[in-house]
A protein has these predicted regions:
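Short amphipathic helix-loop junctions that connect adjacent transmembrane helices
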Residues: 6-25
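Residue-level signature of mid-helix packing/kink "hotspots" within the transmembrane helices
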Residues: 35-43, 127-128
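Paired small-residue
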Residues: 68, 79-88
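Helix-breaking motifs and short loop linkers at transmembrane-helix boundaries and internal kinks
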Residues: 74-76
Length: 168
């Protein structure tokens, strides 16, 4: 979500026109919706994981997140964009808890702290690299390419997880 974050206010302002105060309020509401749905799914994904394998959920959540990013770009108005951000938050909220659980259970107990540390470090680096990349992509090719490239990353992740699911 952080990769799209820096361009979201600009994209919404372009979509709406209008004064900065209204845009800021709407952006805040949309970010809240995405965050709330992400928290909701993160807290409840364990129930789903009791019925469906974690790799399968990761594949589906990654693919759905990719589709949702494309749909966000295609939304004709700001409130449908907000709705799609909510759906994206929901699918995205499943990914980190499951990925961390799979990582933690795949390594011996004595290496678990190190692996979780690396995972957290890379996630935090992504929180920096994502916005930098999206800003550069938006500057070079426009806002639409940020949505498409983010979707591509999630599709790629879904493919990698699918190919490696037997060893997960």
């Amino acid at each position: 979500m952080t990769g799209i974050g820096p361009i979201l206010p600009l994209y919404i302002k372009e979509m709406m026109g209008g004064d900065a105060m209204a845009v800021a309020t709407i952006v805040g509401i949309i970010i809240f919706i995405a965050g709330a749905t992400s928290v909701t799914s993160s807290l409840n994904v364990s129930r789903l994981a009791k019925r469906i394998s974690m790799p399968r959920i990761l594949i589906i959540a990654s693919f759905v997140t990719g589709v949702n990013f494309i749909l966000q770009y295609l939304m004709p108005e700001v409130w449908t964009l907000g709705f799609m951000r909510g759906l994206t938050g929901f699918s995205l909220g499943m990914i980190m808890p499951l990925a961390n659980t799979i990582l933690a259970s795949a390594v011996p107990a004595e290496k678990r702290t190190m692996v979780v540390g690396f995972s957290t470090s890379f996630a935090l680096m992504g929180n920096v690299a994502g916005p930098m990349a999206s800003g550069a992509i938006a500057m070079q090719w426009g806002y639409g390419m940020v949505f498409w490239s983010t979707a591509f990353c999630f599709f790629l992740a879904a493919c990698v997880i699918y190919r490696k699911r037997k060893i997960i």
